[in-house]
Structure formats: structure tokens, C-alpha cells
Regions:
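Hydrophobic alpha-helix feature that most strongly marks membrane-spanning transmembrane helices
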Residues: 113-117, 142-146, 169-170
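Conserved acetyl-CoA-binding loop-helix of GNAT-fold acetyltransferases
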Residues: 124-145
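A short, internal acetyl-CoA/4′-phosphopantetheine-binding micro-motif in the GNAT/acyltransferase core
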Residues: 111-129
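Active-site/acyl-donor-binding loops of N-acyltransferases
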Residues: 156-181
């Protein structure tokens, strides 16, 4: 699916509202395999998630470090689940003045498990839930944070998943679920 912006809402630059689709079609015609996250999501592929392996990618970003953790199929790199971990630089004083709950905290910016979308009224299989991707990604990110000298983890969590973090010793501080490491 494409998340188009209506052409009437584009104020400057190209007024093509389906630019991603056009670029993808052009690359497809040239037999270029797309390997961005959107094209590697499980979607309707038949990969077996029980064959997934964890992968950890580390890179420098904006006066800190980022870690991108994924559970991927070892054959074709299909992504079943991902987590983005931010280790802010220790000298980000202006951020800590505004958000003191983030002082000395590593931050889970995103965590997501992909599966097929369901039709209205269709039952969701609990199979995915029991694979434990989230639990393993969170535990791995906590270990990375601790090894890098952070003494707490903060998670930007939707209200309806806060119970999940509470079961893992997180508590609410302002808008973040926070845990001492």
C-alpha cells in the first residue's frame, strides 16, 4: 500500500503525489531488488517466523548512537519484527532540561512486529504473540543500553500497550514507560 499525499496539499517541489510508486515501478522495470524495510516486511510472504534470527545494526547518529534490531529470515532477510534503540549523547543538556525523565536513559523509539492484516471479523492467530519477538528485542536492547553505561530505559508506548511494559518492570513517567537497568 502507498501512503500518498494529495497533490492539492503539496506546496513546493514535485507535485507528483505518487512519487514512491513511480520510482518503484521504474526500478522494478530495471530488475532492481528493493531492500528497504517496507519491501522486507513479512506482509503476505510465506516465510516461517520460527526460522528468524536476530540482527543488530549499530551506527552513529545526531550526537549519539542508534541500534536497529531485527528478527529476519536468514535466507531472504524478510523482517518479522524490529526495534529502534537510541543512545543519546551524554551532553544533550538542553533535551534533559525539557525532558528530565530521559536523563541517563536509552530510548526505545519504535518496536513493531509485522503480520498479515485481517479482514473485519477475522480471528488473529496467537501464533505470532508466542514467538516472543518483542520480549527478546526489548531484553537485547536493555543489555546494549547497560553495556553502554545507561542506567535506565525509556519507551514511547501507546496507552494500550503500557500493560506489556508494566509486566516487565516499567512504570509511567510523564509520557514514557521507564525502567531502571
Amino acid at each position: 500500500t502507498y501512503r500518498d499525499i494529495p497533490a492539492s496539499e503539496i506546496l513546493a517541489g514535485s507535485h507528483l503525489s505518487n512519487l514512491r510508486q513511480l520510482v518503484e515501478e521504474k526500478l522494478h522495470k530495471k530488475w532492481v531488488k528493493l531492500v528497504d524495510i517496507r519491501h522486507r516486511e513479512i506482509k503476505d510472504k510465506k516465510n516461517n517466523p520460527q526460522h528468524a534470527q536476530i540482527h543488530i545494526f549499530e551506527y552513529d547518529a545526531s550526537n549519539g548512537k542508534e541500534y536497529f534490531l531485527t528478527f529476519e529470515d536468514r535466507e531472504d532477510r524478510t523482517i518479522f519484527s524490529l526495534l529502534r534503540l537510541r543512545l543519546p549523547g551524554k551532553d544533550n543538556h538542553e533535551i534533559y532540561e525539557v525532558l528530565p525523565e530521559l536523563k541517563d536513559a536509552a530510548i526505545i523509539r519504535e518496536i513493531h512486529t509485522f503480520w498479515d492484516q485481517l479482514s473485519v471479523g477475522e480471528k488473529w492467530s496467537i501464533f505470532w504473540q508466542h514467538l516472543g519477538f518483542w520480549k527478546q528485542l526489548i531484553e537485547t536492547s536493555e543489555k546494549i543500553a547497560k553495556e553502554n553505561g545507561y542506567n535506565k530505559m525509556a519507551v514511547i508506548a501507546w496507552v494500550w500497550v503500557r500493560w506489556y511494559y508494566e509486566k516487565r518492570w516499567y512504570h509511567l513517567e510523564w509520557e514514557y514507560m521507564v525502567k531502571s537497568l
